[in-house]
Amino acid sequence: MTSEAVFIQVGALADGFAPHGNLLATASLPAGENFTFYVAGSEPQQLVIEDEQTLSWNGKRAPWRATALRPDILFIDFLDPERDNASISAVCNLTQRNATLVYGQLPDEAPRAGRLQPGRTRVALTAVEVRFVFARLDAQPGPLPGFTDALIGMRNQYTYSPTERYEHIYLNDNFYAWQCLDGVEKGLADVDRCHYVQVAEDLYLFVWREKIIPTLGVILIDLQQMRTDGKIMGYQGSDFGALSNFPVGATAKILNVTRHQE
């Protein structure tokens, strides 16, 4: 009889991913560089790089990290200076002059998975919240990113480091299945809520929200270079006392693709 699966906290996951991870080098942005995100019907949001460690988001300061999976694609990630236990990830397409803003929020207590009960409506299957905003990087009209089903049916393998390897199966618009093949979560698997956004040709933003251990993943998947880049956010321990918001990257391999007949 096998032992019961034990899901680990995100802090332990970060420790496992850290040694020799397949991370991109950080992107250097000059002090004073600014990005204005124009959203129809809303006030523009302002991001200003103050120095190599600090940015300003609508006038409030926060530490930041940026990478460039492609020369014209910036991934800027930081903890939300206006909310506790929250982050903002900005994916900027400098060629198309548009962006996707991902606002993530962790619960402040242990989550309870939602389920159907007689006479009641369904509650959320995960306590991790996410909100997407599609914006222009200038005041001129133009194309915006959008949700996509292009990844659905793919079964991919991701190698995050010499010791950490995962498999993903993108099931439908709302869910994907994952399992850890090697690493600190080896033998663990689940089906979790997810979202897909097309950023550019063969480049996708994949966001997932785990229900057992409160976790938010925000990852770019480049099917031309066959690699990924992004971050994972959760709590360091089970006491919900400190956040772990750490970068991740992987090499990618498409194992197969399933297309169901309608």
UniProtKB/Swiss-Prot annotation:
Top-level taxon in the UniProt lineage: Bacteria
Propeptide cleavage-removed residue intervals: 1-13
Record's protein name: Protein MoaF
Species in which this protein is naturally found: Klebsiella aerogenes
Source species taxonomy: Bacteria, Pseudomonadati, Pseudomonadota, Gammaproteobacteria, Enterobacterales
